[in-house]
Amino acid sequence: SHNIHIEQNKMLCSKCHASVNRHGELSMTRADCLSCHHSEENNCETCHEIQVQFYSGTIGILDDEESDIMFEEDIDCRACHDPGDQVIGKSEASFCIDCHDSDYEEVLINWQDSIQQQHDKLTSDLNLIDPDKLDTVNQNKLLSIQQGLDKITADKSLGAHNYELISRILEEFQRNVNQMLD
């Protein structure tokens, strides 16, 4: 947050913090934050580039990436993240049933559980690899896997933005890691 506001956007500390009662105390309310963030004219991609890249299938990790089916149907971010005109960061599984049947709430939960399990296994297996014992090709693969995994972690959706793509990426990474461990 400070990196984005102070370093990238060159905002003054006093924009959010006051020294009236106690130096550095946050003086802004959620409404103040929302006056800049998530206003109608803001494009989600401006701040949520990784999430949009996963959703649109343009993250650049695999050669044959596909967009999420909801992206194909022109469902924008606000459909899941703006129920009732109150923008939220993390969409709730219960919001799925606003457009889908009641069983669909479990679909998202199952997707996220599956991605979490894949992510945890891959992370655990990565810790078993000694990069110094790998040849240059595998060292480069390992670096790509770590960078891709960082993007998946930064997405924070556990597959909600594109379950099929994120699952395929993790499967491909796991295959490569398994080969390195053999």
Indicate residue ranges for each PLM-predicted region.
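Histidine-centered catalytic/metal-binding microenvironments
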Residues: Q139-D182
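Short, charged low-complexity intrinsically disordered segments located at boundaries
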Residues: C77, L128-D130, V177-D182
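Inter-heme linker and motif-flanking segments adjacent to c-type heme-binding CXXCH motifs
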Residues: S1-Q118, D132-T136, I152-E164, R168
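Residue-level signal for cytosolic alpha-helical hairpin/rod architecture
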Residues: R30, T123, Q146-L149
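Surface beta-strand/loop "capping" patches
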Residues: L122-L134
